[in-house]
A protein has these predicted regions:
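Ser/Thr/Gly-rich flexible loops in soluble cytosolic domains mediating phosphotransfer, phosphorylation
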Residues: 69-98
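Generic structural signal for well-ordered alpha-helices
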Residues: 60-67, 169-170, 195-202, 226-234, ...
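A short, structured N-terminal alpha-helical element that caps or precedes a catalytic domain
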Residues: 1-69, 76-79
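Core AdoMet radical
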Residues: 5-10, 46-52, 123-229, 240-250, ...
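Residues that mark the start of a beta-strand
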Residues: 1-4, 105, 118, 149
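Short, charged, surface-exposed secondary-structure boundary motifs
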Residues: 47, 59-60, 79-86, 120, ...
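Canonical Radical SAM [4Fe-4S] cluster-binding loop centered on the CxxxCxxC motif
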Residues: 15-19, 102-141
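A structural motif corresponding to the C-terminal lobe/cap of the Radical SAM core domain
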Residues: 204-212, 221-337
Length: 337
């Protein structure tokens, strides 16, 4: 059987596709990140595509047009997320094949599944249910000669029973693992023990080079709980400058530029690094609210780019040129205004 596995979006290796690669061992498996058929591509007996993000709808549509009989799954469709287990009619599987990602040398997996919270924009509670422990660090690591670098995809690490997360922390320390908490820890529910546990093992970016802890501040109403968590982490030894905070924008119907900049400026004042995550139409603007910036024409995608590129450190958003390639270009624009 000739099979095409297609990663439609996402930076990290796609776990669903690695599960399919494991299932199709012995078949002729082709992996691609191209959503359209190449000129010399063969015909396939089966085509799969996996997409994570809702904003990938255009790429999903192009993929389906190129491969009309493809099986497409993933969380991009929040109303009806399709899982590998449903497609293959199997129970939840933790077996996957890394061979489709030959340049990836870390290990990736979950110590727990599910989430205690029920955020309206998130598919995890519907898809995975209540928190439960599923793996040890040792079972996630691929073993020698692979580096002791772990990408943890847990959505609610501290939501599993306390004795379980403490055991995982012990494994990380004893095994001298470097861990990237890719999905973020829930800073709203963090306590002193959890903060100290994180500080004791260190937290790393996805390249395992820089100290970084991922978390989120999605709702303005969570301000007090968010900063309570920030203070607990700082007291434990994790400075705010080491936090990268996912910042949901465009979800709340009351969203305005004033509300967005309130969260943004509260974080940057503490050297926290925000990372906007856009809900819905990326090219729309918002009401100003009480914001006195001249940004009524700016879009959410432009704001996201301005923040991710850290252009806010040297040029106001209203003067930001989204086509500028680097700091020099932006600085020249600022001088010309």
């Amino acid at each position: 059987m000739r099979v095409r596995l297609t990663q439609i979006d996402g930076k990290l290796p796609n776990v669903a596709l690695m599960k399919l690669a494991h299932h199709h061992r012995g078949d002729e498996v082709h992996f691609s990140k191209h959503v359209e058929r190449d000129m010399l591509e063969p015909e396939y007996d089966r085509v799969y595509g996996s997409a994570i993000f809702e904003f990938s709808a255009d790429r999903v549509a192009r993929f389906r047009a190129a491969f009309p009989h493809a099986i497409v799954g993933g969380t991009f469709d929040r109303a009806n997320p399709v899982t590998v287990e449903a497609v293959l009619n199997i129970e939840d599987s933790e077996a996957w094949d890394y061979s489709i990602y030959p340049g990836f040398d870390a290990s990736i997996g979950f110590t727990q599944r599910g989430c205690r919270l029920k955020c309206g924009f998130c598919v995890v509670p519907k898809k995975e249910g209540k928190p439960r422990s599923v793996n040890t660090i040792a079972s996630i690591w691929r073993g020698d000669p692979w580096p002791r670098h772990i990408h943890l995809l847990d959505n609610d690490f501290f939501g599993q029973p306390r004795e379980q997360w403490k055991a995982r922390i012990g494994e990380i320390k004893d095994g001298k693992f470097k861990v990237c908490w890719n999905q973020g820890v829930n800073i709203r529910t963090i306590d002193k023990d959890a903060a100290e546990a994180l500080a004791s093992v260190g937290c790393w970016d996805d390249g395992f080079k820089t100290r970084r802890l991922y978390t989120a501040w999605d709702n303005l109403g969570d301000e007090e709980r968010f900063f309570s968590g920030v203070r607990l982490l700082e007291a434990a030894g994790i400075h705010p400058r080491n936090l990268l905070v996912y910042m949901l924008v465009g979800y709340d119907r009351r969203e305005t530029w004033e509300r967005i900049f309130y969260r943004f400026e509260k974080m940057t004042a503490l050297e926290i690094r925000p990372y906007p995550m856009i809900f819905g139409n990326r090219e729309r603007t918002l009401p100003l609210g009480g914001c006195n910036r001249r940004i009524a024409h700016r879009t959410l995608s432009e704001f996201q780019r301005w923040v991710i590129r850290k252009a806010y450190t040297f040029i106001p958003f209203e003067h930001y040129d989204v086509n500028a390639k680097g700091r020099a270009d932006c600085s020249q624009l600022a001088l010309a205004v």
